[in-house]
């Protein structure tokens, strides 16, 4: 039996007992959170002005502190970072327009400065950075985004969107390049998505089928998905967990039909999969907190398992913070007082701003830098710099060694295409939302990705597996 116990003090959540340890929360007399603890150890605390005033400081148990100052209208003005054992330094500076909207912000650690413009309805319309990178939004009378423009300071990319009378996206358009069209059934479920060139020729399509309605039930989960080279069929249990996936190659293919089946416990945790795609049967076991504690692999079978697995991996967890993994299959892990991983085998991790990854060193050193929102804007690996250009939460483009890789999204912030060296490649996803293929603008599948049930990449195949397959970061 699994249970979480919640305790309250004056109607405020004071603790959560889970897996044999506690998460604790403390408050001041005004209800502001003053500290959070895990397994009896304080991991973060907050300081405020007197009499229910503004937040002044966030203090992390690993020694990092962030201090906040405000303008005369109580808006963030400047924040400061004091790393553990170091002196305080300026972190972010904020400037506002006369309407009170943020119009300029600078992150002093990464050197990023953004200027923000708004339309007459105070909707964010344009953002520019110090290097000339810019993105813009255009809206229609229904407050729907109909255009997104992005430039890296040299080239530019414009994506247009159209909608039906119910506000559902009908088309994503890249002027002069391609259009992705979406069809729906009378219940609003997606039934087809197709990519077509500017001349109207269809280069790729994906179709979806759903189980027939029964006993006044309609199903939102597809029972079949047909893509370029194969179709996938799905079965589910009453909780919506996938119990079977069958991959059927199209007629004329030399590939086999592959079927994977899945079993779950009463907590909807995957406990066994019989995987023809991996040619093995895998059994999973968990502790009372839902943490994976062992993985056993056997030769593929749908029947009774032999006593001894072909391969087994096990994990151990902290005796106090019982969700904290200390060792997996012989690889040890250590953490700081906040719970950030410090080492994993021979790999060393360092952190900044309390919870932001600053560096990974495993023989090659990778450093990371962030903007005021916490988005990663730069990576340096052994001296090679990659700059990431964000449009809100979306990675719009990245530049490295003089080249730019672009990303195209639909109006729901889902990836549609990637542009590498001026060539377009369309993303193909399965029902689990894994990116399983890249298709070029002629309709040819050039990269295939295979994952395990946890989303770990198992293989990359296809004619461009060693170039585009590796360059695409979304896999």
What feature does the model see in each segment?
Residues 24-35, 45-47, 57, 67-75, ...:
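Tandem repeat domain/solenoid detector
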Residues 42, 311-332, 336:
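Extended, small-residue-rich solenoid/repeat segments and analogous flexible loops
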């Amino acid at each position: 039996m699994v249970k979480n116990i919640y305790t309250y003090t004056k109607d405020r959540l004071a603790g959560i007992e889970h897996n044999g340890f506690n998460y604790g929360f403390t408050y001041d007399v005004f209800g502001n959170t003053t500290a959070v603890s895990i397994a009896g150890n304080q991991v973060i605390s907050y300081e405020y002005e007197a009499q229910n005033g503004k937040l002044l400081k966030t203090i992390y148990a690993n020694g990092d502190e962030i201090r906040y100052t405000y303008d005369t209208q109580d808006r963030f003005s400047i924040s400061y970072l004091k790393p553990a054992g170091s002196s305080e330094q300026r972190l972010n500076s904020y400037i506002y327009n006369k309407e009170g909207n943020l119009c300029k912000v600078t992150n002093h650690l990464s050197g990023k400065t953004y200027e923000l413009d708004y339309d007459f309805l105070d909707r964010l319309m344009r953002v520019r950075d110090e290097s000339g990178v810019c993105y813009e939004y255009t809206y229609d009378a229904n407050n729907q985004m109909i255009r997104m423009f992005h430039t890296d300071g040299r080239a530019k990319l414009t994506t247009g969107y159209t909608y039906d009378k119910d506000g559902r996206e009908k088309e994503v358009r890249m002027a002069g390049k391609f259009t992705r069209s979406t069809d729906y059934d009378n219940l609003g479920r997606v039934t087809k998505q197709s990519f077509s060139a500017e001349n109207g020729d269809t280069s790729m399509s994906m179709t979806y089928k759903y189980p027939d309605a029964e006993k006044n039930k309609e199903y939102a989960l597809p029972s079949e998905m047909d893509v370029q080279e194969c179709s996938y069929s799905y079965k589910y249990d009453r909780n919506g967990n996938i119990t079977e996936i069958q991959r059927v190659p199209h007629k004329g293919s030399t590939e086999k039909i592959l079927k994977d089946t899945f079993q779950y416990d009463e907590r909807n945790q995957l406990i066994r999969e019989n995987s023809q795609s991996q040619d093995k049967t895998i059994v999973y076991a968990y502790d009372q907190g839902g943490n994976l504690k062992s993985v056993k692999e056997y030769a593929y079978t749908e029947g009774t398992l032999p006593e001894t697995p072909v391969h087994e991996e096990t994990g151990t967890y902290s005796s106090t913070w019982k969700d904290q993994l200390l060792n997996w299959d012989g690889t040890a892990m250590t953490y700081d007082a906040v719970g950030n991983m410090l080492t994993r085998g021979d790999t060393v991790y360092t952190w900044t701003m309390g919870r932001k990854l600053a560096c990974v060193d495993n023989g090659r050193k990778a450093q990371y830098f962030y903007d005021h929102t916490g988005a990663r804007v730069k990576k340096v690996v052994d001296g090679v710099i990659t700059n990431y250009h964000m449009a809100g939460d979306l990675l719009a483009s990245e530049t490295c060694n003089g080249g730019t890789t672009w990303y195209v999204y639909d109006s729901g912030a889902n990836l549609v295409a990637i542009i590498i060296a001026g060539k377009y490649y369309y993303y193909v996803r399965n029902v689990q939302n894994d990116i399983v293929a890249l298709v070029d603008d002629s309709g040819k599948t050039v990269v295939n990705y295979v994952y395990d049930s946890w989303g770990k990449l198992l293989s990359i195949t296809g004619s461009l597996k060693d170039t585009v397959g590796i360059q695409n970061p979304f896999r």
